[in-house]
A protein has these predicted regions:
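A cross-family signal for N-terminal binding/gating loops and helix N-caps
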Residues: 3-198
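Serine residues within intrinsically disordered or low-complexity segments
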Residues: 198-204
Length: 204
């Protein structure tokens, strides 16, 4: 498993490998720096995970629902591409509530796939998009893999998960899951790769 808890050691994940001569060898991820030389290039996916999982209720019935934010479609209109659960009960025209004071409300305006929906958030704080995003993300949780959420007694992420489920070089917001290989890079390993006099490039 790539990620279990805050006790997870990012760079100590190990794998049984076979060397060039066909001999079995056990390596930890942090050993990767031993295979790079001066002049080599590290390419990092610097996409930053945002708190994409929201929990709320459906209008009238107060049924519990889950919304997984995928991407913002239109900032001015507050449109988001999302996945929903339970999909069969969330239809066009339904309103979804995400807080106790009904400030963060979304209306379903389109079905995109069996679980996919387009939501329009009915939130207006003087038209300030940054305030809206901060308020929306404050209600969200770290988008941990489902097998981790299901294994927890309360089925929720913690505040610490947002840091643990993030690559140390993450910079540009937009990911709903951390790049798997990048999760293994610890800050110490990042420093070691820099000391190799290798070049670093990023993609988002």
């Amino acid at each position: 498993m790539l990620f279990r808890s805050e006790m997870y050691k990012k760079d100590e994940n190990g794998k049984d490998m076979v060397d060039a001569d066909g001999n079995p060898v056990f390596l930890q991820f942090k050993d990767i720096v031993n295979y790079f030389e001066e002049g080599d290039t590290f390419i990092f996916n610097d996409t930053k995970v945002f708190p994409a999982r929201l929990y709320g209720t459906k209008e009238k019935t107060d049924a519990k629902i889950e919304v997984f934010l995928l991407r913002e479609l239109n900032a001015e209109m507050r449109l988001w591409d999302v996945l929903v659960e339970p999909a069969r009960k969330i239809r066009i025209g339904n309103k979804l509530f995400f807080d106790d004071v009904n400030e963060m409300v979304a209306e379903v305006i389109d079905n995109t796939t069996s679980r996919g929906r387009t939501l329009r958030f009915l939130y207006d704080e003087d038209g300030n998009h940054d305030v809206f995003k901060r308020s929306l993300f404050a209600l969200g949780e770290a988008p941990l893999p489902r097998y981790i959420i299901d294994a927890r007694e309360d089925h929720h992420a913690t505040e610490d998960d947002m840091d643990d489920f993030q690559c140390v070089f993450a910079d540009k917001e937009g990911a709903v899951t951390a790049p798997a290989t990048g999760l293994h890079f610890s800050r110490e390993l990042d420093r070691k790769s820099t000391r190799l006099n290798s070049s670093h490039s990023s993609v988002s």
